[in-house]
Every structure is written in structure tokens, then in C-alpha cells.
């Protein structure tokens, strides 16, 4: 029964891909982003910050922030929406605000409500040996986490879902040299994050969210079709669709996560 069910899942998923062509998606985003500074070097209780007055403290925090205080909400949201719309076309689905008094969510009329986006900036430490075994260095890097909460509808029932992704600095190269006193000095070449890089990341998110939304509706269709036929449905065999290779495959973690 399980093998038969797995085969049936893919069959119904391919059916969904065909039947969903021309579907209309109404996509909504929040008016603004929530921004949270979690950098440990910006904690006002740090010994180097607690002695500062309010103005000095704010100036110091602003100087240490890499991304958070530079984000233009409108730019971030607009590039994400445009990317979402373009990605939908790859699935033969269109962005269209179809809602009216005569139309409700159904198999060809979907709502993707991205109700909340939180962007956090924090510090990480990456451990590297810098090419000398036994000599390990902690390298300070910055991570920007983008967490998003969704409400998805293709019938009268709402589903609430979540996903998060990181925009990270990473080590390009790390090596030791010697100073004038013959002491080892660590040299680290970081791939730095930037505000332009974050907007490029928003483009990636728009494409990802379009794919995740399509996949959710596809799996919802598969679940309902199996239930009609009294076939077993396994949450562990979540399906994704690649519109470029026209291929359906299994995943465990690369998806929207339902919030109970």
C-alpha cells in the first residue's frame, strides 16, 4: 500500500501541474518589515557601551550594524514581488488580484498572504584552521535572517505556514603570515554582505516563495485526491516541482512549514 501510495502521489502531482495552468494568484505582502537587532556587539549592557550616553550609544550601534539600518522596505518588498510574479510564469500561473464578490478561492484562484516578515541581524563566529592544522581561529561574521509567515488559501480553509533563510558572510580565504617579530598573524578574506546583496537576496526569496506556494497547493491537491480514494498519504513524502526540468521530486525540509 505504501509503494502504491507513493507512486500515486507523483501521479496526482503531475495531474495538478497540468490542471493548474492558468491559475490566478493574489499575492499580498506587509506594509513594512519588522527589523530586529540581535548583534551581541550592540547590547547596551556590554562593558564598552554601558558607559556611553544615549546619543553616543545610538551612534555606536548604528556604526556596527551592517544591513539593518540601511534597508529600504519599499525596495525590498518591490523587488521580491516582481521576482515572485516572474517566477509564477515558469509554473504557467499568473499574478492577478482576482477577488470579487462572485469569486472565492478554489483550484484556479489562490491567495498567498505573506502577512509578516522579520529581518534579524546577528553575529556568528566561524571556526577555521587557516590551513595550519591545530591552529584554530574564530572569525566574526554577520548573518541576516529573513523569516516569513504566510496564510495560503485555495478553498474556504486557511493554512498558516513559515519559512526562514539566511544571507551570510562567509570565508573566502584564511591564512597565516608572520609579523616583524616573527609572530603568527591571521589573515582572513571575507565575502562581505551588503545592502545591494540583500536586495539580490530578496529576488531569490521571491522566486523561492513562488515555488514554495505552488508546491504547497500541489501537495494539498495530492492529499485530497488520495483521501478520496482511501489511499495512504505520508507527510514524509512531500513533493516539489521543478518547472525548468518539468520534474517532481521528494523533499523533507525544503518547503514551507505548517504552523499548528
Ranges and model annotations:
Residues 6-86, 223-260:
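A structural "domain/chain start" motif
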Residues 50-55, 128-135, 175-187:
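A subset of solvent-exposed loop/turn segments in beta-rich extracellular surface proteins, enriched
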Residues 63-70, 153-227:
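Short secondary-structure boundary motifs at beta->alpha junctions and helix caps
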Residues 85-93:
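Sec-exported extracytoplasmic/periplasmic mature domains
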Amino acid at each position: 500500500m505504501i509503494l502504491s501510495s507513493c507512486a500515486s502521489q507523483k501521479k496526482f502531482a503531475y495531474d495538478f501541474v497540468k490542471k493548474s495552468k492558468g491559475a490566478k494568484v493574489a499575492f499580498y505582502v506587509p506594509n513594512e518589515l519588522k527589523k530586529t537587532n540581535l548583534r551581541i556587539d550592540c547590547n547596551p549592557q556590554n562593558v564598552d557601551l554601558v558607559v556611553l550616553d544615549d546619543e553616543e550609544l545610538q551612534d555606536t550601534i548604528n556604526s556596527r550594524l551592517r544591513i539593518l539600518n540601511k534597508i529600504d522596505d519599499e525596495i525590498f518588498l518591490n523587488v521580491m514581488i516582481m521576482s515572485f510574479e516572474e517566477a509564477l510564469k515558469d509554473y504557467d500561473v499568473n499574478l492577478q488580484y482576482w477577488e470579487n464578490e462572485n469569486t472565492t478561492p478554489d483550484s484556479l484562484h489562490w491567495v498567498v498572504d505573506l502577512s509578516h516578515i522579520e529581518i534579524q541581524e546577528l553575529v556568528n563566529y566561524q571556526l577555521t584552521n587557516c590551513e595550519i592544522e591545530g591552529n584554530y581561529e574564530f572569525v566574526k561574521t554577520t548573518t541576516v535572517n529573513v523569516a516569513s509567515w504566510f496564510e495560503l488559501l485555495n478553498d474556504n480553509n486557511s493554512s498558516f505556514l513559515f519559512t526562514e533563510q539566511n544571507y551570510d558572510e562567509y570565508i573566502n580565504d584564511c591564512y597565516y603570515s608572520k609579523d616583524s617579530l616573527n609572530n603568527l598573524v591571521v589573515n582572513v578574506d571575507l565575502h562581505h554582505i551588503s545592502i545591494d546583496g540583500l536586495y539580490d537576496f530578496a529576488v531569490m526569496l521571491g522566486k523561492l516563495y513562488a515555488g514554495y506556494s505552488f508546491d504547497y497547493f500541489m501537495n494539498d491537491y495530492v492529499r485530497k485526491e488520495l483521501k478520496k480514494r482511501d489511499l495512504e498519504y505520508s507527510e514524509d513524502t512531500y513533493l516539489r516541482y521543478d518547472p525548468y526540468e518539468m520534474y517532481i521530486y521528494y523533499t523533507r525540509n525544503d518547503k514551507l512549514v505548517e504552523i499548528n
